[in-house]
Amino acid sequence: MPSAIGIDLGTTYSCVGVFQHGKVEIIANDQGNRTTPSYVAFSDTERLIGDAAKNQVAMNPTNTVFDAKRLIGRKFDDPKIQADMKHWPFTVVNDCGKPKIRVEFKGERKTFAPEEISSMVLTKMKETAEAYLGQSVKNAVITVPAYFNDSQRQATKDAGAIAGLNVMRIINEPTAAALAYGLDKNLKGERNVLIFDLGGGTFDVSILTIDEGSLFEVRATAGDTHLGGEDFDNRMVAHFVEEFKRKFKKDLSKNARALRRLRTACERAKRTLSSSTEATIEIDALMDGIDYYTKISRARFEELCSDLFRSTLQPVEKALSDAKMDKSSIHDIVLVGGSTRIPKVQSLLQNFFAGKSLNLSINPDEAVAYGAAVQAAILSGDKDDKIQDVLLVDVAPLSLGIETAGGVMTKLIERNSRIPCKQTKIFSTYADNQPGVSIQVFEGERAMTKDNNLLGQFDLSGIPPAPRGVPQIEVTFDLDANGILNVAAKDKSSGKEKNITIKNDKGRLSQADIDRMVSEAEKYREEDEKQREAIAARNQLEAYCFNLKQSLDGEGSSKLSDADRRTVQDRCDETLRWIDGNTMAEKEEYEHQMQELSRVCSPIMTKLHQQAAGGPQPTSCGQQAGGFGGRTGPTVEEVD
């Protein structure tokens, strides 16, 4: 059976793993890196994903897209998105209330939904796994922050579909990390484990009870879907923009390229400060020819981000109170996510737990993908001893309910309820002879629906006339294992029934949208492939030219007539000039040039080789000059 993979789709980096031969393999990409930047770049000639996209970001800041996870499943007017737009060099536009990313690609203006950008990253992860496994991959488990709401989960699932994946399950990142921890450590007995997951863009805290290393039960979860390493980078960037303004009276914030180079340097400095107490920033010709050399101490960095670091403790307190536990009942504190390497974050957490030592034994960058790979193996029926007894019980991160008279939020499913779960309540009409009811579904913790998030609504009509309070309307909430909600309403007297899967219609892609994006993704993939083939043909032609020119200086070349020598030299120079002037040519054009060059030069080179070898030799015009030839046909001759 083809392997199912686990993908950690991160804000800044993504990671993919597969469970085989009794263990998880985290798969390195084509650059040899076990994590891949969640970046997609568009240029005049091509689309780049991952390391290649991040490496060229300073040259092409406005068309290099990242942070799609901070956009996915949100509305354009979300205050978080409005704040982020100040930091992003790419353009985000409002498309009927949804954020879309606008870029220039191959000379045209294009807009992409966040799901499409995420799907491109997922495609890269899928291809990374396929290259390693040597077979095509269809099934995947994708992780999301535990605190992602319904629409963010749906949108992530859609991104998987656009990438051509069958998303077997959406699982929570801290839960996946707990799986990695529990299986890696062979835990005995019952242990309460707190997962503290601070990544590039999101923050989660989950408390689980792990029993005998096989039953993983989430007791509570809390977090902030908009807090992570990028926010720390932003603080450092703002600090240096001010310093530059003070020192040189110039404003970096108006220059996208300079800002991007500064951000890259800040990200590097932040990492340095996790192991050193001081970091140096050196950027040549940052703006208007000014070389910018400066330093930042760990203490200064901690002061710049102090409120953000402290804010990580609130979700810890909330999770403890929801799980009805005190600090002393936590056995293990497990750190996940690259930002947990920051010493101040560690010391704040350790002090909160009265000096209890933190568990640093799992790889914070890979733990989530590891757990996702295990869950993928479980769901695809892998009977390996290590995982066959594993049972994962997760919870709903937010309360779910409907609006009742006066705008009150009436909850059917409380937050931190086990999933999957189903709850039914009976409601009635508010007025005499009311012909129908409007069911409005919300998620959130506030008492009034206006303060919570509307997920969707539908009408149940055809209720027989009756005094208020008499009709019995049965509303059922069914929350599946992905944390996605189905709602049904039934009038008990007439038997009329209506149900919806909450699709958050204002925010969710329709099936038609998804189908269109799937075919576009296929088109982009084919274009990428054509681009690769054209580059290969160009390189082959160029190499052939240089090999020919080298042969003119090689041994035996003095036996060539001046006319022949000039012919080869001129044709090579002419071809190289053509290559320089036609960098966007198709593969066929390069191949045609190759054939023309070979037609003129091969006979001359054959002559050269025969003379060099002191007489006629069996040769093949297709194999001259370092193995590059344009002609097809036999490449050997019979020798008498």
From Swiss-Prot:
Example of a GO MF term: ATP binding
Q: Which Pfam family, giving just one, matches this sequence? A: HSP70
Keywords of the record:
ATP-binding, Nucleotide-binding, Stress response
InterPro entries in the cross-refs: ATPase_NBD, Heat_shock_70_CS, HSP70_C_sf, HSP70_peptide-bd_sf, Hsp_70_fam
Keyword Nucleotide-binding assigned to the entry: answer is yes
Q: Which SUPFAM superfamilies match?
A: Actin-like ATPase domain (SSF53067), Heat shock protein 70kD (HSP70), C-terminal subdomain (SSF100934), Heat shock protein 70kD (HSP70), peptide-binding domain (SSF100920)
Q: Where is this region: Disordered?
A: 608-640
Q: What does the similarity note say?
A: Belongs to the heat shock protein 70 family.
This one is known as: Heat shock protein 70 A2
Taxonomic source organism:
Anopheles albimanus (New world malaria mosquito)
Read off the lineage from the record: Eukaryota, Metazoa, Ecdysozoa, Arthropoda, Hexapoda
Q: Which gene encodes it?
A: HSP70A2
